[in-house]
Amino acid sequence: MNYPIRIVRRRKLAVGFVAVAALAAAAGATLLSNTAQAASTLGAQAAASGRYFGTAVPASKLGDGTYVSILDREFNMITPENEMKWDTTEPSRGNFNFGPADQIVSHAQAHGQRMRGHTLVWHSQLPSWVSSITDANTLRSVMDNHITQEMTHYKGKIYAWDVVNEAFADGSTQHRSSVFQNVLGNGFIEEAFRTARGVDPAAKLCYNDYNIEDWNAAKTQGVYSMVKDFKSRGVPIDCVGFQSHFGSGGPPSNFQTTLSNFAALGVDVQLTELDIAQAGTTQYSNTV
């Protein structure tokens, strides 16, 4: 079935997402279904083919009746737009603010919508007190504590967490420069995932990035190699999120290959963002 998707953006990253099965049996994207609801909404259409359909939600819009009506009618998965990012949840060391995200989680629970946690470790929207840390032991303690406190607060309420977000450099198989990479080295991603699994064994743990749709791209290969290595060594990773930013030509011709190859590693593949720039109705329909 074809339907257009429009994702509203604010600040650096707002996530709307669809879980897709690269190969229906391989991807294993589970979903909320509502058998009493006709397949006339985005969420119901997705459910009919074993998928879910979600959107980014800012807490500030939950008081808008029109917005909420569309949200609750069309979507069965919710991602907080910015409310779970580090600069909001821990603006100063050890002082946590979960109020805005709590509003979104409460809404989702009241309306039978799953929640995606976004995001625990990211180089952007990071408070200056974190980005200025130069001691490895201090940063490791800070990172592990942040993951532990936030995941503990929402334990049992989050379907999947973006544990680490956008850690790879554009056009490269290597990690980007960040306080985590520069101070802790390559092992920070593994440590973040191991810490996360220890806090909430039931939540799916995801790595999320953009420009990893083209199978031949260096960045795609870098992420693939990391996931393959993690799976071979028992590092807990359950899913890979693809921030799918396409032009009028739609996705790369080998996008299906990319999804299939990641799914073959034993991880869910999820479209965590989807936008199609400068495209007409036909291009939207063909892509979606």
Residue ranges of predicted features:
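Bacterial N-terminal signal peptides
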Residues: 16-30
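C-terminal region of N-terminal signal peptides and the immediate post-cleavage residues
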Residues: 27-42
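Boundary/entry segment of secreted carbohydrate-active catalytic domains
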Residues: 39-81
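Acidic-and-aromatic substrate-binding clefts and catalytic sites of carbohydrate-active enzymes
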Residues: 56-68, 86-99, 168-172, 212-221, ...
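Substrate-binding cleft and catalytic face of glycoside hydrolase catalytic domains
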Residues: 42, 73-91, 99-212, 278-281
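Glycoside hydrolase catalytic-domain groove-lining segments
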Residues: 104-114, 182-208, 220-288
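N-terminal export and membrane-targeting signals
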Residues: 2-20
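Short, acidic/polar
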Residues: 58-74, 101, 140-151, 217-230, ...
